[in-house]
Amino acid sequence: MAKLEKYNEKRDFEKTAEPKGAEKKRKAKKLHYVVQHHLARRDHYDFRLEWDGVLLSWAIPKGPSFNPADKRLAIRVEDHPFDYKDFEGTIPKGEYGGGTVMLWDEGYWEPIADVEVGLEEGSLKFEIFGERLKGK
C-alpha cells in the first residue's frame, strides 16, 4: 500500500468518485497504458503506465504529440491505482485535481530497457501500442 500512500492522502473518497488506492498485481501478458485529458485548474494530459500493481503517472502540460521528433515535458506525479485507467468523470471543485477527466487514448506498452533503472535515471525507454499513439 505504500506505493499509493500519497495518492490516498490527497483525496477525500467521501467526495470524489475516483477509485480508492489499492495495488492490483496481475499476471498480465500485456501492460496497460492510458492517456487521460484532465481539464483541471490547468488543462493538461495524464500519461499512465501499468507497472508492479500500480499506474506510474506523469502530467504532460502541452499534451501528447503525434510527431516523434517533438519533445514534451513530463512531470512525475504520485502513482495511481490500476483501476484509475478506467476513470472518467468530474472531480469536485476544491478537491485535489478538481475538474473533468476524459479518456484520450489507451492500449498497451512494452519496456525496451530496465524500467526500475529508467525511473531512477529519469528516462524510460518503451514502445506504446495505442488507439491514437504508437511508437517508441
Regions found by a protein language model. Name each.
Residues 1-136:
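A charge-rich, low-complexity, intrinsically flexible signal that marks solvent-exposed coils, linkers
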